[in-house]
């Protein structure tokens, strides 16, 4: 199905974004493209997910986040084992100058 409309879902945490996107899914607006995370202030990260009318449908949505790459890999593989599919590219958010980052990946289920 062709995409006929897009909108951006946004929240100040993964815990808050997931239910926002799930509400969009219930209204037939489905996640499209990768999750974007932006370090907005020294203590705040904002998360963005485009949702679209049309395109690939989904019945569920979740996000895996971790500041540890090995932990992130384990959590992502567990999501895949549970029947979820990665959505778009992962987001790597630099939290502080240097190497402190947060890895984030959105997942959907058909």
Question: How does the language model describe each region?
Answer:
Residues 1-110:
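Terminus-proximal functional modules
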């Amino acid at each position: 199905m062709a995409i006929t409309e897009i909108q951006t879902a946004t929240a100040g945490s993964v815990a808050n974004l997931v239910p926002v996107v799930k509400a969009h899914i219930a209204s037939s607006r489905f996640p499209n493209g990768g999750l974007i995370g932006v370090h907005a202030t020294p203590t705040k990260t904002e998360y963005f997910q485009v949702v679209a009318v049309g395109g690939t449908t989904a019945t569920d949505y979740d996000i895996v986040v971790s500041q540890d790459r090995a932990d992130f890999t384990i959590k992502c593989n567990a999501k895949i084992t549970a029947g979820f599919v990665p959505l778009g590219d992962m987001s790597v958010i630099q939290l502080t100058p240097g190497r402190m980052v947060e890895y984030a990946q959105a997942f959907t289920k058909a």
